[in-house]
C-alpha cells in the first residue's frame, strides 16, 4: 500500500530575534536582560557591560565587555541587532565629572548612530531616559511634554540629544521611567539605610512633592513592551501607580519597619549631597500617559505602592540573609 506524501507547504519558522542591551549589568539594564530572557526564550541576547561583572548575565547571554565610547563595532556585523535597548550612561560623582561624562557620552552616541546607520538592516533603538527630563510640574504630565531637565537629567540631556536629532535612523523609541523602586539605588541609599541608621524614615523638603513609582521588574517589563507593542519613534512614560507624596511614601516604609518619619530640610540635603541630588529628591513630577491601550497591554505585577514596597523589602531581607 502506497501513501501519498504530504506536500502541503509548511510555514518557515520565524527567525529568532537578536536583542542588544547596552549597560546590561547596570540597575535597569540587568532587569531588561532578565525580562528579554523570560519573554523571548529563543532569542539571542547580546549583553554589553562595562565595569560591573554579573555572573547571571554572563551565563545567560552572549556577553561582551565593552565601553560605550571605545567599542569594537565589528560585533554589530557578527551579531546584527533587530533591536537595541540603550540603558548605558557615563556617570560622574560631582558636577565636573558629570559634565565630562555628558560630553563623552555625546561623542559615543554620535559614533553609535553612525555605525548603526551603516548596517544593511537598521535596528530599532529603545533609549532609556527618565522623567527628570521634564522638570518640576504643577500637574500630571503625559507624553510629549516639553523637556526642562533638572538634577541628573541636566547632564544626561547632552549625551541623549544625538538620538533625538538624528535623521540617520528610522526608528528611535524612548522610555521615560519615573521613580524605579528596587532593592538598590536611591531607595536603599536615601530611605532604607538612613532609616535603619537614624531610627526614622526621612522625607526630604516639605514632603509634599509627588512621586510616580514603578517596581524595577515592571519597569523592565514596560521597556520591553515598547519593543513588542510600541509605535516607532514614540516615547512612553514608564510608571505603575498613581502619584503619592513623598511624606506618604516615607510613612508606608515606616509602617513596615516600625519606625516614625521625620523631615530632612532641602538645605540640609543639599549641604550633605549637593544640588543635583537635592533637586532629584525634592522634584515634583507626577506622570500619566496618553497611550492608555498600550499601558493596559503591559499587565503589571506590582500596580500598587504597597505591593512594590513589600516585594522590595523582601528582596533586601533576602540579600542581607545571604550576606550574613
Residues covered by each model-derived region:
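Amphipathic terminal alpha-helices
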Residues: 2-4, 8, 303-324
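N-terminal Rossmann NAD(P)H-binding glycine-rich loop of SDR-like oxidoreductase domains
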Residues: 13-41
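N-terminal Rossmann-fold cofactor-binding loop
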Residues: 47-53
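NAD(P)H-binding glycine-rich loop region in Rossmannoid oxidoreductase-like domains
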Residues: 53, 57-115
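Conserved Rossmann-fold NAD(P)-dependent oxidoreductase catalytic core, especially the SDR/UDP-sugar
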Residues: 110-152
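Catalytic helix-loop patch of NAD(P)-dependent Rossmann-fold dehydrogenases
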Residues: 136-175
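NAD(P)-dependent short-chain dehydrogenase/reductase
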Residues: 170-174, 178-210
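Mid/C-terminal beta-alpha module of Rossmann-like enzyme folds, strongest
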Residues: 220-277, 310, 316-324
Amino acid at each position: 500500500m502506497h501513501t501519498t506524501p504530504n506536500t502541503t507547504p509548511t510555514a518557515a519558522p520565524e527567525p529568532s530575534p537578536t536583542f542588544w542591551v547596552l549597560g546590561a549589568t547596570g540597575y535597569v539594564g540587568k532587569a531588561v536582560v532578565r525580562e528579554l530572557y523570560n519573554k523571548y526564550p529563543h532569542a539571542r541576547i547580546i549583553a554589553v557591560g562595562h565595569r560591573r561583572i554579573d555572573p547571571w548575565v554572563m551565563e545567560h547571554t552572549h556577553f561582551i565587555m565593552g565601553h560605550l565610547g571605545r567599542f569594537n563595532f565589528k560585533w554589530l556585523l557578527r551579531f546584527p541587532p533587530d533591536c537595541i535597548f540603550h540603558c548605558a550612561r557615563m556617570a560622574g560623582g560631582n558636577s565636573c565629572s558629570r559634565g565630562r561624562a555628558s560630553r563623552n557620552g555625546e561623542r559615543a552616541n554620535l559614533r553609535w548612530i553612525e555605525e548603526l546607520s551603516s548596517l544593511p538592516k537598521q535596528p530599532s533603538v529603545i533609549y532609556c531616559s527618565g522623567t527628570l527630563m521634564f522638570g518640576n510640574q504643577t500637574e500630571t504630565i503625559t507624553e510629549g511634554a516639553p523637556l526642562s531637565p533638572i538634577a541628573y537629567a541636566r547632564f544626561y540631556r547632552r549625551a541623549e540629544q544625538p538620538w533625538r536629532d538624528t535623521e540617520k535612523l528610522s526608528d528611535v523609541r524612548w522610555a521615560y521611567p519615573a521613580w524605579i523602586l528596587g532593592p538598590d539605588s536611591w531607595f536603599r541609599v536615601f530611605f532604607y539605610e538612613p532609616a535603619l541608621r537614624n531610627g526614622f524614615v526621612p522625607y526630604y523638603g516639605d514632603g509634599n512633592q509627588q512621586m510616580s513609582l514603578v517596581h524595577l521588574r515592571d519597569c523592565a517589563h514596560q521597556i520591553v513592551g515598547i519593543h513588542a507593542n510600541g509605535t516607532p519613534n514614540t516615547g512612553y512614560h514608564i510608571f505603575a501607580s498613581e502619584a503619592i507624596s513623598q511624606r506618604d511614601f516615607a510613612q508606608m516604609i515606616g509602617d513596615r519597619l516600625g519606625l516614625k518619619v521625620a523631615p530632612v530640610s532641602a538645605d540640609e540635603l543639599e549641604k550633605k549631597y549637593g544640588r543635583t541630588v537635592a533637586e532629584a529628591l525634592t522634584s515634583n513630577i507626577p506622570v500619566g500617559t496618553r497611550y492608555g491601550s498600550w499601558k493596559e497591554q503591559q499587565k503589571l505585577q506590582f500596580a500598587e505602592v504597597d505591593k512594590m514596597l513589600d516585594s522590595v523589602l523582601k528582596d533586601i531581607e533576602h540579600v542581607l540573609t545571604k550576606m550574613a
